[in-house]
């Protein structure tokens, strides 16, 4: 009986301990669970802010990548268009067609540009030869001053016409006019900005028009000096333009392929195109100087001296053309 009671007591104690442990276990399990729930509730607003911020950052990064991709694609597309335009220009020049910078075939190099001017210049030269022959006959026949004036005025108007034709042709192809491709090789050796130097022409005429009065000599000397100064200013302007253009083109040199280099290349070429646009202005100023010099020379001289001056100018350029013909026809070993 004592053993049974002892076992009962022991069992009761164990049961009680087990219950206590179970309660303690449950309590241990419940307490931490309640604490975690409170922590989750307090951290939830912060977690939502972080998530929103992360989502915003991801969206901003995605948009940035899309913008960069679109920018690179645009640059590559522009580079391809530029290369295609250059190919079109080269192809057109081989076929004799001038294409404007916008890609529109607004001028035909052979139809409305250089070749047309070459034909017009040939007709102009033929007409000038007729006028000069008429003037020479009148001078040799000792025609009256009034008759000489009519012929001289006609020749001066004819010079005005060639300057007008050059201005029109320069709008189609300024390089053709500036380079003197419409002139003979010997004439091109003495070419300055698409024509003759007024100052050099005046030097040539002074020796051909003697005797001259002191007032005429002074007038021609002043005209020669002012022409020389204007020519020097235009020459310096052309040199500055050429240097600026060279610097612009050199600035675009470098390894190709990256979007930055493509953008830089296109920007530099656009700047160079803008600077080339000033060539027409230089040519126009040079022709204005030539035209004004001829008219001022006529006002300084008597009508008979002006007639002799026009004959001397024509004979000088005729000899240059004849020299070119002889040079081209020379025997070659």
From Swiss-Prot:
Any one GO molecular-function label of the UniProt entry: sequence-specific DNA binding
Positions of the DOG1 domain: 114-330
Region (Leucine-zipper): 75-89
GO biological process, one term: DNA-templated transcription
Keyword list, A-Z: DNA-binding, Nucleus, Plant defense, Transcription, Transcription regulation
Basic motif as annotated region, ranges: 49-69
GO cellular component assignments: nucleus
InterPro entries: bZIP, bZIP_sf, TGA_domain
UniProt KW Nucleus keyword: yes
Main location: nucleus
bZIP domain: residues covered: 47-91
Ranges annotated as biased composition (Polar residues): 1-14
Compartment annotation: Nucleus
Residue span of region Disordered: 1-48
Record's compositionally biased regions (Basic and acidic residues): 37-48
Disulfide bond entries: none
Chain's role: Transcriptional regulator involved in defense response.
Subunit structure: Interacts with NPR1/NH1. Interacts with NPR3/NH3.
Entry similarity comment: Belongs to the bZIP family.
Protein name (Swiss-Prot/TrEMBL): Transcription factor TGA2.2
Gene encoding the protein: TGA2.2
């Amino acid at each position: 009986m004592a053993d049974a009671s002892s076992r009962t007591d022991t069992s009761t104690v164990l049961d009680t301990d087990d219950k206590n442990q179970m309660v303690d276990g449950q309590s241990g399990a419940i307490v931490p669970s309640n604490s975690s729930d409170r922590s989750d509730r307090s951290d939830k607003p912060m977690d939502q802010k972080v998530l929103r911020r992360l989502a915003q950052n991801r969206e901003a990064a995605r948009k940035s990548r899309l913008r960069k991709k679109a920018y690179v694609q645009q640059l590559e597309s522009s580079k391809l268009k530029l290369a295609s335009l250059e190919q079109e220009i080269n192809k057109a020049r081989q076929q004799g067609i001038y294409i404007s910078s916008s890609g529109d075939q607004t001028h035909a190099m052979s139809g409305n540009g250089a070749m047309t001017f070459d034909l017009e210049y040939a007709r102009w030269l033929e007409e000038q030869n007729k006028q000069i022959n008429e003037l020479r006959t009148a001078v040799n026949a000792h025609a009256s001053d009034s008759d000489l004036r009519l012929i001289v005025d006609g020749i001066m108007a004819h010079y005005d016409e060639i300057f007008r034709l050059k201005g029109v042709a320069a709008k189609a192809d300024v390089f053709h006019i500036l380079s003197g491709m419409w002139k003979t090789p010997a004439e091109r050796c003495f070419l300055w900005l698409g024509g003759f130097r007024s100052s050099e022409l005046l030097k040539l005429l002074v020796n051909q028009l003697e005797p001259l009065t002191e007032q005429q000599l002074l007038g021609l000397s002043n005209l020669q000096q002012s022409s020389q100064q204007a020519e020097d200013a235009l020459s310096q302007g052309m040199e500055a333009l050429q240097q600026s253009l060279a610097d612009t083109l050199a600035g675009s040199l470098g390894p190709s392929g990256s979007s930055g280099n493509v953008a830089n290349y296109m920007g530099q070429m656009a700047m160079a195109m803008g600077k080339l646009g000033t060539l027409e202005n230089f040519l126009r100023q040079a022709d204005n100087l030539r035209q004004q010099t001829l008219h001022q020379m006529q006002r300084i001289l008597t009508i008979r001296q002006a007639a002799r001056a026009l004959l001397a100018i024509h004979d000088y350029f005729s000899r240059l053309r004849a020299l070119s013909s002889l040079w081209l026809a020379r025997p070659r070993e």
